[in-house]
Amino acid sequence: MDSLYRNAAETPVEAPFVFDSHILAEALKNLYKRKYDPKKEIDPLLFSEVSRILGKAVDEGFGNSDIEDEFIRQLKSSTEVFSAFKTHRMGRDMAAKLLDDKGQLKSYRQFKQDVLPIASHHIDNWLKTEYNTAVRRAHLAADFERYKRNADILPNLRWEPSTSVNKRELHIPFYDRVWAIDDPFWADNFPGSLWNCKCGISPTDDPLTDNSDIITLDVKPHKGLDGNPAVTGQIFSDDHPYHPTDCRHCPFGKVKPLQITNSTKDCHNCGKVRAVIQDAEEKAKQRRKDLMKLHYLKLKDKIKEDFGLDSIVRIPAPKSLCTGKLKLTPESLKLCLKGYAHTPSLDSKYCLLKAIQNPNKLQHRDYKALGEGKDLSNPIDKKNVEKKADRGVTGYNYYLFEYKGKTWVLGFEVINGEYEQPYFVALK
């Protein structure tokens, strides 16, 4: 994968996601305890985390686009297939570190020490490249769909040059050329067909350019990026190295050669792959619930031990909070620590704990009055604002906090202008 991704970006790219370290830790324990066979199975929690992140990439790529939900679901479905094979590759690579040179099972401490660099490479290097490419391809797919709807006004598309400082040569011959939007060219040649490609498309009514010389060019997409996602409905194609070369080598239900004599590999529409994904999703749902409950109780007990509940706690460095007071109640803690809506990962929950323990490190960045930026003509928004006002909420203070090498945004409700209480945690 390093050779495939090596030219993905001129400089390291900071992906706006956090791979939940607690889920990775749980996956390592499951692998060590042989709770699943990494040769033909995947860890449900590990899969769900990879799938969540790549699904988030699709959402980010589409933004506030008015593209139909069904098309977005189709693209997300394709990232689930990719996630299943990526998770299998991760499990297989990590399982290779279970035994020592004598074939004996290592201590868990040694196994963890040996395997963390591999996990880090999969996540910090490869997944970031995959995430950024998924965002770009989803965005371009949304653009293509939108431009097709307006083809009666602007019937052609121009290939826009890459915005990268160091442009790669493969797509340079396409720069500033114009094709009809329904030209077959776009099915096989499309921006985003190279890892972290930063080329683009734009609609135009300019005349078509002479593209006859393009036929002689042998510009092949990178492995895993074949085809226009707006045409195929796939963010990643199944020729990516994570995928098997053919059905006989598939880890998810190997079949005899005679059974697939007339079959063509189609991972995105394979019933066996879908069955693996469905099983992993069902198991992950319950395991996430159990994991969240376990850590919620740990966090709750720790905060209660350090600060107590139902009490206004004076901050050691009052200037770090605008009001100088932080109130921790069972209600506010449950809101932030038990569910997903306000703190979507275990890391975000532990970030809140660390911030409460070290309030002097909070950096105030903004304040918004209750209702600011909301459409109060919308009955739902209006009711939500009124409900908060009844609780005494007058506004929100936003703070930055460093945790695990990332910058987080913490939102605190301001109650009657007197004190603050935790409300949400999000990655900056």
Regions found by a protein language model. Give the residues of each.
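N-terminal leader/targeting and assembly helices and adjacent pre-domain segments
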Residues: 1-119, 206-355, 359-428
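Internal glycine-rich, Lys/Arg-flanked active-site/core loops of soluble domains
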Residues: 100, 108-133, 137-153
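Short, charged low-complexity intrinsically disordered segments located at boundaries
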Residues: 125-127, 143-145, 161-168, 200-202, ...
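A broad, low-specificity signal for short, low-complexity segments enriched in glycine/proline
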Residues: 55-57, 117-121, 155-165
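Conserved short secondary-structure elements within globular domains
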Residues: 134-208
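N-terminal start-of-chain detector that recognizes signal peptides
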Residues: 66-71, 127-133, 168-174
